[in-house]
């Protein structure tokens, strides 16, 4: 190994025997350590943010801005994974064959796309109401509002693993609560900058119609898979 500073050949170690400069292996180790420390700090910040939102959901969410973008993305992905995971585990326990793609992967993608679409509808409603909010800020706040409902879905998964029937009631509360409570909560959190061009009530009604159509498509997908699973 040659020192990158003075060119002296060395048999190894952390530093050059001649000039004392750090050898490349040490730099790589430091970079890995820095990456690990950054990941640990990010996880700590996410956990702290989640706890603060769970303690005071609306107050914390309405103060959330673009600085929580990563937390919003993590929450959205986690929310999208939980329901398909429950159904995949449910079908896997039976005697029939289970399609990982149809039961878990595709619904997860549908959930992610739906959440993006739901936020896009809310963002559009805010814009036509005259709010000068950025997409990054509104998306981060949307992810913050998802946190309590993601916690409910985690609770549903916990009871599901304990084989209790109440898990599906909790699941319904988490899903219906998220899809029908977040839009008015989001719109209300920006009411201080409302310019009165379009009333929030009408925006909420349109968003609810889109949600109902999407719910119908998701239910039809799972009903088809259930019949396919039972028949084949």
Swiss-Prot record:
Membrane topology: Multi-pass membrane protein
Source organism superkingdom: Bacteria
Subcellular location(s) of the protein: Cell membrane
Spans through the membrane: 69-91, 104-126, 139-161, 166-188, 200-219
Keyword annotations of the record: Cell membrane, Membrane, Transmembrane, Transmembrane helix
GO CC terms in record: plasma membrane
Protein name, as recorded: Uncharacterized protein YvbI
Source organism of this protein record: Bacillus subtilis (strain 168)
Phylogenetic classification of the source organism: Bacteria, Bacillati, Bacillota, Bacilli, Bacillales
């Amino acid at each position: 190994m040659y020192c990158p500073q003075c060119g002296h050949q060395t048999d190894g170690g952390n530093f050059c025997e001649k000039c004392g400069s750090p050898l490349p292996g040490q730099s790589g180790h430091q970079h890995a350590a820095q990456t690990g420390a950054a990941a640990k700090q990010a996880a700590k910040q996410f956990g702290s943010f989640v706890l603060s939102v769970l303690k005071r959901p609306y107050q914390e969410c309405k103060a959330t801005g673009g600085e929580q973008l990563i937390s919003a993305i993590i929450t959205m992905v986690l929310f999208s994974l939980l329901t398909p995971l429950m159904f995949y585990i449910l079908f896997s326990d039976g005697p029939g064959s289970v399609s990982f793609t149809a039961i878990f992967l595709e619904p997860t993608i549908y959930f992610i796309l739906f959440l993006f679409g739901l936020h896009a509808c809310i963002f559009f409603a805010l814009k036509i109401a005259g709010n000068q909010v950025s997409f990054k800020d509104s998306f981060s706040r949307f992810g913050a509002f998802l946190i309590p409902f993601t916690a409910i879905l985690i609770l549903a998964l916990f009871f599901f693993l304990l084989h209790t029937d109440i898990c599906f009631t909790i699941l319904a509360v988490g899903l219906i609560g998220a899809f029908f409570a977040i839009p008015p909560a989001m719109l209300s959190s920006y009411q201080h900058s409302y310019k009165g061009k379009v009333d929030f009530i009408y925006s909420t009604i349109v968003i609810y119609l889109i949600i109902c159509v999407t719910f119908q498509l998701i239910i039809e997908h799972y009903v088809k898979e259930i019949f396919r699973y039972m028949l084949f």
